[in-house]
Amino acid sequence: MSLIDPRAIIDPTAVLADNVEVGPWSIIGPGVEIGEGTVVGPHVVLKGPTRIGKHNRIYQFSSVGEDTPDLKYKGEETRLVIGDHNVIREGVTIHRGTVQDRAETTLGDHNLIMAYAHIGHDSVIGNHVILVNNTALAGHVHVDDWAILSGFTLVHQFCHIGAHSFSGMGTAIGKDVPAFVTVFGNPAEARSMNFEGMRRRGFSEEAIHALRRAYKTVYRQGLTIGQALADLAEPAAQFPEVAVFLQSIQTSTRGIIR
């Protein structure tokens, strides 16, 4: 039995691997490539150039690979690249890149993009990321591995969301979020670290304790960023997790949420 519903509209130049399933009324345009085992539900629109990897699942009414609404976009050829084992729930929108940046929007592996979330042009999403319902990322946003953005989180363009970080519901993020940090509010403020997430992912208690001390150095001792980073050099040499936290602050271009 065919896995392609006869009511789907698929451009003859689209490339679908073995065992790709396409539901009724979905539209797959030219320049779309879909890896094996991926399931495209009903009423989905896929626009190219877009490459989708293996064993993804895209739910109804999602729009994936559409042109960016950026006013600088003049129809140049840009891309969307999606990895493997992602779940893209109902009504999600993901836009391709712009030539003013990398000309590519990227979604890694094992991500959960929940209903009505938006991923803007040129954004880079790592692996094991969760975007909860109605989270919206503006253009050029980077989200590192294992970050969780709770429902209705808004992220300003060019922000960097660090690995293992967490945002509370309705948070408005306008600066970079360091790795492991938990932020809440509008505007966002740092509240703590994502200790529960660390424990669930098997971090040692020694590493968690070192990160707790590092957080206090940056956020609770009244130091400048330069002073805090200098104090973190020694623990960063001992604990790779602290080094990740330190690097996420050092490489910030928008300044960090404090």
Curated annotation (Swiss-Prot):
Keyword terms of this UniProt record: Acyltransferase, Cytoplasm, Lipid A biosynthesis, Lipid biosynthesis, Lipid metabolism, Repeat, Transferase
Protein's GO biological process: lipid A biosynthetic process
Principal subcellular localization: cytoplasm
Location(s) in or outside the cell: Cytoplasm
One Pfam assignment: Hexapep
GO cellular-component term (any): cytoplasm
Gene3D superfamilies associated with the record: Hexapeptide repeat proteins, Udp N-acetylglucosamine O-acyltransferase, C-terminal domain
InterPro entries from the UniProt entry: Acetyltransf_C, Acetyltransf_C_sf, Hexapep, Hexapep_transf_CS, Lipid_A_LpxA, Trimer_LpxA-like_sf
Catalysis performed (reactions): a (3R)-hydroxyacyl-[ACP] + UDP-N-acetyl-alpha-D-glucosamine = a UDP-3-O-[(3R)-3-hydroxyacyl]-N-acetyl-alpha-D-glucosamine + holo-[ACP]
Entry's EC annotation: 2.3.1.129
CDD domains documented for this protein: LbH_UDP-GlcNAc_AT (cd03351)
Metabolic or biological pathway: Glycolipid biosynthesis; lipid IV(A) biosynthesis; lipid IV(A) from (3R)-3-hydroxytetradecanoyl-[acyl-carrier-protein] and UDP-N-acetyl-alpha-D-glucosamine: step 1/6
GO MF entry, a single one: acyl-[acyl-carrier-protein]-UDP-N-acetylglucosamine O-acyltransferase activity
HAMAP family per record: LpxA
Subunit and interaction comment: Homotrimer.
Function: Involved in the biosynthesis of lipid A, a phosphorylated glycolipid that anchors the lipopolysaccharide to the outer membrane of the cell.
Family stated for the protein in its record: Belongs to the transferase hexapeptide repeat family. LpxA subfamily.
Name this polypeptide is given: Acyl-[acyl-carrier-protein]--UDP-N-acetylglucosamine O-acyltransferase
Native source organism of the sequence: Pseudomonas syringae pv. syringae (strain B728a)
Source lineage: Bacteria, Pseudomonadati, Pseudomonadota, Gammaproteobacteria, Pseudomonadales
